[in-house]
């Protein structure tokens, strides 16, 4: 079976790993970094992903960041007159990760395990699966990020029984999961979280502080200036990272804007104490889900054996202090918070291919599932933290006499009223025989698969008529849309490959021009003038093609010059061989001289003996 890669598709950074020799290994990108910024940019019709896209984000308004925050919604971003869905943008990132995984493995990759925040609802999970499909990946499994982290942590500890709490604070989402490990079984006991809380919010409090201080001093609101705002964002992210290691940092942004008197600069010292004051409400917000997860698991903090920190934002000292205070445990430092999720996904890939044996993963559904019943009430069929895969059925009836159709409104959430929960989808069961209300028997069945994706079935027990759907939220893509996007993604991949080939050919041509000039210098006076002229003419023709930037012409002229240079190089080697032969003859004649040297050496020894 072909390799199944593990992908941590993050809000701010993404990571890809693979199982090699039974061990998960992170694959570095082309720049040599082990994580890749989840940033996509469009410039002159060309797509840029990762480091290169992030670097030019200040000057390029067509840059998309933190798209994961919009997964499962009908949000669209317009770039150069075209609307992109979160699934399409995520697919561009996935394609990039896939391409450098293929370069590393030396084979085509078509299967992946992709991680999602544990608190992602059905629409968000489905959107992630669709993004994988658009990127040309068969998503073998969607697994929760904290569960993946637990897999990576516990793979070599399967003989120990322990209860672990995974605290996952990423760039845009926050999750807490409590798992029990033992005998190779990873069982999730409970999960809780907040999909609108992450490192981006910690950056934002610094940005707001900088904007406020600058306005106080200069009377100018930087939040209205797009380019200044992007510079502030970069500076805030850097300051946040610095403050994990030092107690104060200098933020210096020269020429941030211009006032009446001329250019203005932003200079400010931010202390760790001030940052902790600004972000204290965010740290406290993470404690709610921690308490909720403990309560749902029926455990006290003292019953937790290990605390695993996941996500770059867990490096913030105030976060570490808060979790230590809440659980009474020092966090386990043996895992890399940026890579552990991708490593866990790669292990799950190994479980699927059969390379990892005796590991069983039992995950849960993060939110309760049910339908709307009379009076707008939300009636739960499957409670949150139920182990998946699972299915549950319940019999309902009609609310009015002679009702021939029922609307099934499927929801996910914890609130008692339907209006306060997330709509997953609606469908109708029709052709119910007219009867007094309360008589028809309609069985509604929910089925959640191992990816946390929901299927719902409604059946009239009287007639046996059945209607079922895989939930497609209002933001979900139709099969036709996905197919179109897959096609576009493939076309873009071909265009990217062609562009890459053009750059490589151009670089080779430049190198060949330089090489030719060097070779001609070395051959000066050693070959016919006519051959030198022929090479010079071919070199000038290639230079002209490079200047015109005509790909096919560059290719043809490059091949032409290459042939001439090879002939010249052969001449050079022939000359060298002749010179060597001549040298060899001289050496043979000089053997008598060698004897003289020996005699001279003996003579010295004789002198020494006389002494």
Swiss-Prot record:
Molecular function in Gene Ontology: ATP binding; ATP hydrolysis activity; ATP-dependent protein folding chaperone; heat shock protein binding; protein folding chaperone; unfolded protein binding
GO terms under cellular component: cytoplasm; extracellular region
Pfam families, alphabetized: HSP70
Induction (UniProt): By heat shock.
Biased composition (Acidic residues): 595-611
Subcellular location as annotated: Cytoplasm; Secreted
Region (Disordered): 579-611
UniProtKB keywords: ATP-binding, Chaperone, Cytoplasm, Nucleotide-binding, Phosphoprotein, Secreted, Stress response
InterPro entries: ATPase_NBD, Chaperone_DnaK, Heat_shock_70_CS, HSP70_C_sf, HSP70_peptide-bd_sf, Hsp_70_fam
Residues annotated with Phosphothreonine modification: 173
Coiled coil: none
Gene3D superfamilies: 1.20.1270.10, 3.30.420.40, Actin, Chain A, domain 4 (3.90.640.10), Substrate Binding Domain Of DNAk, Chain A, domain 1 (2.60.34.10)
GO process terms (BP): chaperone cofactor-dependent protein refolding; protein refolding
Compositionally biased spans, kind Low complexity: 579-589
HAMAP family in alphabetical order: DnaK (MF_00332)
Record-stated family: Belongs to the heat shock protein 70 family.
Chain's role: Acts as a chaperone.
Descriptive protein name: Chaperone protein DnaK
Species for this entry: Bacillus subtilis (strain 168)
Lineage, broadest ranks: Bacteria, Bacillati, Bacillota, Bacilli, Bacillales
């Amino acid at each position: 079976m072909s390799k199944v890669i593990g992908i941590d598709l993050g809000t701010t950074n993404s990571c890809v790993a693979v199982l090699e020799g039974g061990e998960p290994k992170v694959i570095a990108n082309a720049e040599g970094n082990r994580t890749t910024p989840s940033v996509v940019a469009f410039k002159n019709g060309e797509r840029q992903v990762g480091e290169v896209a992030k670097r030019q984000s200040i000057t390029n308004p067509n840059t998309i960041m933190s798209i994961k925050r919009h997964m499962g919604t009908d949000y669209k971003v317009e770039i150069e007159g075209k609307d992109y869905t979160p699934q399409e943008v995520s697919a561009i990132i996935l394609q990039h990760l896939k391409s450098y995984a293929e370069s590393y493995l030396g084979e085509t990759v078509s299967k992946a395990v992709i991680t999602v925040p544990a608190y992602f609802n059905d629409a968000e999970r489905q959107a992630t699966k669709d993004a994988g499909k658009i990127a040309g990946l068969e998503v073998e499994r969607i697994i929760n990020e904290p569960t993946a982290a637990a897999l990576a942590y516990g793979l070599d500890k399967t003989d120990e029984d322990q209860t672990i709490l995974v605290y996952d604070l990423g760039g845009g989402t926050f999750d807490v999961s409590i798992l029990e490990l033992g005998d190779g079984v990873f069982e999730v006991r409970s999960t809780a979280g907040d999909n609108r809380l992450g490192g981006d919010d910690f950056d934002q409090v610094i940005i707001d502080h900088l904007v406020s201080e600058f306005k106080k001093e200069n009377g100018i609101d930087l939040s209205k200036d797009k380019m200044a705002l992007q510079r502030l964002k970069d500076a805030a992210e850097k300051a946040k990272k610095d403050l994990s290691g030092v107690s104060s940092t200098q933020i210096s942004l020269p020429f941030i804007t211009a006032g009446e008197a001329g250019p203005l600069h932003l200079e400010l010292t931010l202390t760790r104490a001030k940052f902790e004051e600004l972000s204290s409400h965010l740290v406290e917000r993470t404690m709610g889900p921690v308490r909720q997860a403990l309560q749902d698991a029926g455990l006290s903090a003292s019953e937790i054996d290990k605390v695993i920190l996941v996500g770059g934002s867990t490096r913030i000292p105030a976060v570490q202090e808060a979790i230590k205070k809440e659980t009474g445990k020092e966090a386990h430092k043996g895992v890399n918070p940026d890579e552990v999720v991708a490593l866990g996904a790669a292990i799950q890939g190994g479980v699927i291919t059969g390379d990892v044996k005796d590991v069983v993963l039992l995950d849960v559904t993060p939110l309760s599932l049910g339908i709307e019943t009379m009076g707008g009430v939300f009636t739960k069929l499957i409670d949150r933290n139920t182990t998946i895969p699972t299915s549950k059925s319940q019999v309902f009836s009609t609310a009015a006499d002679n009702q021939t159709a029922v609307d099934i409104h499927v929801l996910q959430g914890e609130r008692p009223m339907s209006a306060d929960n997330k709509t997953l989808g609606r469908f109708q069961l029709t052709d119910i025989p007219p009867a007094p209300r309360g008589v028809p028997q309609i069985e509604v069945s929910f089925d959640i698969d191992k990816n946390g994706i929901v299927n719902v079935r409604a059946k009239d027990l009287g007639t046996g008529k059945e209607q079922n759907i895989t939930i497609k939220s209002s933001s979900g893509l139709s099969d036709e849309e996905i197919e179109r996007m897959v096609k576009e993604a493939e076309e873009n991949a071909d265009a990217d490959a062609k562009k890459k080939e053009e750059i490589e050919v151009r670089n080779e041509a430049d190198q060949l021009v330089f090489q030719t000039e060097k070779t001609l210098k070395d051959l000066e006076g050693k070959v016919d003038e006519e051959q030198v002229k022929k090479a010079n003419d071919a070199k000038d023709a290639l230079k002209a093609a490079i200047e015109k930037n005509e790909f096919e012409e560059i290719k043809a002229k490059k091949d032409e010059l290459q042939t001439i240079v090879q002939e010249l190089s052969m001449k050079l080697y022939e000359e060298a061989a002749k010179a060597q032969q001549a040298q060899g003859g001289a050496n043979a004649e000089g053997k008598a001289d060698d004897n003289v040297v020996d005699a001279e050496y003996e003579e010295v020894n004789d002198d020494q003996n006389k002494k």
